[in-house]
Amino acid sequence: MEFLSRISQHLGIVEDVDRDGTVFILGKEYAPLNNKSRTDVETDDSALESLINIVSLNPGLLSDVHSRVFFTYRTQFTPIRRNENGPSPINFTLFFRDNPINTLENALTDPDSFYSDIGWGCMIRTGQALLANAIQRVKLAREFRINASRIDDNELNLIRWFQDDVKYPLSLHNFVKAEEKISGMKPGQWFGPSATARSIKTLIEGFPLCGIKNCIISTQSADIYEDEVTRIFHKDRDANLLLLFAVRLGVDKINSLYWKDIFKILSSPYSVGIAGGKPSSSLYFFGYQNENLFYLDPHNTQQSSLMMDDLEFYRSCHGHKFNKLHISETDPSMLLGMLISGKNEWDQFHTYFRDSQIIQFLTTRPENDLYQSANMSVGSDSIHSLESDIQDTGEYVDVGTLVSGKQMSSPQPKDEEFEDVKCKSQRIIVCEDPADPEVEQVLVEDSSSC
């Protein structure tokens, strides 16, 4: 049965959809299997059972997943110049994750430039995926599905905006450039959810052709100030508004208090996905079934899109393979994305989430709001360099290290590192011993009041 296992692995989605339980993909609801599914077949062999499942999976579900846009690590892209005070582009690990000949050539000919985002770009890639699916919905509608036999020229033009060169408005290069200007972050440093949100806001507000002219971000919570939204729709009743919430929903894992709300977000018609993941990687979550989150993984390395023909590039940006992760295994630091198209949708959105434990609606921003400036200091946003990434054996930020402040480039005022969510019934307590530098600051969730 090893042969069947290999087939299932090649198909990529065999073991990721259970026979029972409704599947939700960015607001769309699917039965997992066809009516003609062979669920009555009895077998003790899991590989054969998985193969039977894939044959009977709902084709509408598969088409929807395949139509999601996502991005991965790339190599040999247009070089990004290293900042003299930033991390080095050259690391021994790249010889194993990239073509060693390419890595050696880059090291010899241009050692001060990044030709790949391996090890530091996964959060940017998942942020790009979130943004691309939001733009796809605006430009092509949620019902859009790709055709395996031909390229959709309108979507191809959309995806080209994300190609890896500074001349493309939504490229990785411009994500890096935008955040370097905002906070001083340097090429090769790992983006956190807040940095990703700030970059997205900066880039789309400077590129109205994308169709989303308005973006509200919250880098410390999921608070929505109603007066700010009202002004947007007063100016343009049909405006598209992208909401980005960089939140932290627990200490080292998502508090079970929020599970229901995460599922509600992904099943809502407003969701454009979640960028976050496991402690060792950032992933793009686009749906769920039962208590498992479905995701697309940006860590599969591909060559630069500029070296591909149109068809190859087009196919490389669609999620034909996905995986699942139980929500209890998910890192609590994440970026939530939601799209609202017009005043009527805003009213519906407000009603839909009025009882949320994550999203809060407030009348107006208080004058003394500590987070109004979005905390632009370099050390405040989970910066993670390629060098520290190799030491920590993962691309995603180590929450424990962040909370301790050991990776901070400069001392920060108390509590500014934390990306905690200020929910209606949660109390966050910061425990520390200032006299002992070895004692980590820890977020303790007191659920007794929930």
UniProtKB/Swiss-Prot annotation:
Cysteine protease that plays a key role in cytoplasm to vacuole transport (Cvt) and autophagy by mediating both proteolytic activation and delipidation of ATG8. Required for selective autophagic degradation of the nucleus (nucleophagy) as well as for mitophagy which contributes to regulate mitochondrial quantity and quality by eliminating the mitochondria to a basal level to fulfill cellular energy requirements and preventing excess ROS production. The protease activity is required for proteolytic activation of ATG8: cleaves the C-terminal amino acid of ATG8 to reveal a C-terminal glycine. The lineage of its organism: Eukaryota, Fungi, Dikarya, Ascomycota, Saccharomycotina. It comes from Kluyveromyces lactis (strain ATCC 8585 / CBS 2359 / DSM 70799 / NBRC 1267 / NRRL Y-1140 / WM37). One of its GO terms (cellular component) is phagophore assembly site. GO terms for molecular function: cysteine-type endopeptidase activity; protein-phosphatidylethanolamide deconjugating activity. GO terms for biological process: aggrephagy; autophagosome assembly; mitophagy; piecemeal microautophagy of the nucleus; protein processing; protein transport. It catalyses: [protein]-C-terminal L-amino acid-glycyl-phosphatidylethanolamide + H2O = [protein]-C-terminal L-amino acid-glycine + a 1,2-diacyl-sn-glycero-3-phosphoethanolamine. This is Probable cysteine protease ATG4. The active site is at C122, D297, H299. Keywords: Autophagy, Cytoplasm, Hydrolase, Nucleus, Protease, Protein transport, Thiol protease, Transport. It is found in: Cytoplasm; Nucleus; Preautophagosomal structure. Belongs to the peptidase C54 family. It holds the Pfam family Peptidase_C54. Its EC number is 3.4.22.-. Its main location: cytoplasm.
